[in-house]
């Protein structure tokens, strides 16, 4: 199909994959790996890889998912696509017109496009820093008859992202220094508790899934079956990082025992030593600390954990292109006090930092 010198070509996934990371807006939802995963799921009708050429050169490409609408009609969906240079939108009108005509030839009733673009940026206080960043692109779509609205079916994927830019830091220590005092205290505290992070292998994804399902039940969202995540891991390989934060139980018990003995020794030394004006207060403070450690020990016994690891939080991160994206995940509500998610995300920030370096 050729329109205004833009040619739309259907290609196999292997050919598509050769150039899929050549764009600034490269993302895993517009990858051949994701297309293969979608095809492996029975509820997906058809998935197609397209490239757009001008004068023999590829100027864009996209993965399209075709779905049934009201049993009779078919609709086309582009999540985080198409891939192209949005900084120079000269090709965009012709590209979209060519795509529309291509889909009409396939008797597609509707086309939904969710470009991977930032339109509004807010800070931590939800104050608007930048808006209408994609205004020029939006105008192109409007001229071609597209209506702009929030698709509730795709809101969890394309609505908002919490982004941590790290390109201004040269080391992880610099990034840590920029954190708030309270966050730095939490990282230090949770590390002292012997909370650790590891990457799960394909054989252990049930640990991730168990936490995800319980989080979904608690918060009221649906999740794919375990086989979806196993297939995702097979398709993306090392780019799909299933991360688990867990409590090292023997080390945690040793930490409690060490502190209990330390405060018992301190209290006895204060009682045996010279009784000064502030000694009584020091003893009371030490006894409060001692009781808190005994309380933690008794609380740990109620967990009835028989293994050396107590799973706390689990997240799936997609390491793709210039991004590391938190895609799915959750926490065990009973163990939020150990801060598993905090340390897990800090670990992945450091991973992303090492990747940049």
Question: Where do the PLM segments sit?
Answer:
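Short low-complexity, flexible loop/linker segments enriched in glycine and/or proline
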Residues: 125-130, 164-166, 214
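Acyl-donor binding region in acyl/amide transferases
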Residues: 73-156, 310-313, 318-357
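A conserved beta-strand-loop-helix scaffold within acyl/acetyltransferase catalytic domains
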Residues: 9-55, 59-71, 145-156, 166-337
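Short, Lys/Arg-enriched N-terminal segments with co-localized hydrophobic residues
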Residues: 1-4
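Long, hydrophobic, well-ordered secondary-structure blocks that form the structural core
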Residues: 134, 158-165
